[in-house]
Amino acid sequence: HIIGDIFDRGPRADRIMDELMAHAHVDIEWGNHDISWMGAAAGCPALIANVLRIALSYNSYDVLEDGYGLNLRPLSVFATEVYGDDPCERFLPHTLDDVVFDHVDAALTARMHKAIAVIQCKLEGQLLRAHPEYGMDGRRIFERCDFRRGTVMLDGVEYPLADTHFPTVDPDDPLA
């Protein structure tokens, strides 16, 4: 019996999954990160953005590029064009171990992380707006932001946003 979150236990979850699939009988209790990856593999745009964001936040290029063959170049080009002058300090990756080979610049990773985080917020907001039956209106955070003033309203209290540079967000329609 394997207790889940295989995709939240360190680097190269793809290799762990390959090893498990080689066994005839495996009993897995799936965790939330595992389910996110399944949803991404099934094509859910919000979950694709979610797993990309989490992987980038931990500098896990190996699982994305080597393990699953994802081409991150379009995201890196987009992030550089949109956030090239933004240090994206709040989006710097957490590094669990030193990358000796295939080092990726932390500033580029931060830009990519911020770009996919904004995309994820938009996609999740669109999904939740389209499905009020999910009962998750409390998760529609982007629509509670006042991007002109740089604030967010949570539980009736207005807070300043820690980051206010969002050139791809239309203040009148943040989910567009």
Q: For each of these PLM feature ranges, what is it?
A:
Residues 1-176:
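Feature recognizes metal-dependent phosphohydrolase scaffolds
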